């Protein structure tokens, strides 16, 4: 009889713990001393544990959790909190000014019928389904000192592309900072969600000055720790409004050059600079080719009807094209200021050819070998050709356009009559 009672009690305890299970039970606090958990988070983001295939690799416990830009940031913070037995908190929309604020947290018992791994996955999906870029900017992050930017911090973008009326919003995670003061960034997009693709990882990114932060909800920010929701924001570690003051005083001009100087440990050589610019431009156009191809396939899927606002926003390329144009401008300034030599088989030679007004057949062959952008079975461009097309305003960012118009092949009748957003 005693054995039956003990067995019954054990079953009851087991059932009770399952019935009232939190997503996970934290054993630590972010503000624990002497452990610096924020510093550990920064090192974790910089490590190989955070990578492009976090949500696509077969052996990942988080496989098939596809994230756009803000989703990725929330997912990162949840994963680190769970794996290190820390609490997680994010404000529930619409409760910021309520008498009783509500939060998404690991204490939720919504998924107590699931095992722990499944609870964590469900929690991530629930949070990213309900929160986005604006919410992250206004509620779950705060602006920081420019000199204190670290791995794991966020760069938030809000701007109106040239010729457009609708604002573009985006956020990226700083994965690491190079010795020359440029950022490696990792991020998701709506396209990574729709296409179930890997995250983007861009190395040594230098942002263009039109993305300089003018208002409090843009720029370089840090995710709030759970206890910080109850604190005065101005008292938070590294809190600062300096980036907005600097941007407004100088109208954004030279902002990112200033940020780079704060974090630079050494100067790059002329050849290193030439390699960085040439490689970045080549990769940017090749990435654009993949993105345009994805939009064209989506057009086929929807039988070539006009895309609605959401679809248009997902598949258009105004921000991408603007960033490439700014990169071209920076590369040209680099060539004029640093004056790279023409040594054969060097990146310096390639940069000179890229901006030469008198290139011949030999130079064309050299640039084609170094970087060819294949946009379809029928069309390919070398880097000089596609650079000139973009600067001439012939590349279309409209995802409803046919491939010939997307890439500046002069057939104006191919331009869509669908509305632009």
Predicted features and spans:
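Bacterial N-terminal signal peptides that target proteins for export
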Residues: 1-8
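N-terminal signal peptide c-region/cleavage motif recognized by signal peptidases
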Residues: 16-18
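Active-site-adjacent structural segments surrounding the nucleophilic cysteine of cysteine proteases
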Residues: 21-71, 313, 328, 332, ...
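Active-site nucleophilic cysteine motif
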Residues: 30, 34, 38-41, 55, ...
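Sec/Tat-exported extracytoplasmic proteins
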Residues: 77-84, 131, 159, 266, ...
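...with weaker cross-activation on analogous glycine-rich loops/strands in unrelated enzymes
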Residues: 117-183
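Short peripheral tails and domain-boundary helices/loops at the edges of structured domains
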Residues: 176-198
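Low-complexity, Gly/Ser/Thr/Pro-rich intrinsically disordered linker/tail segments
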Residues: 196-364
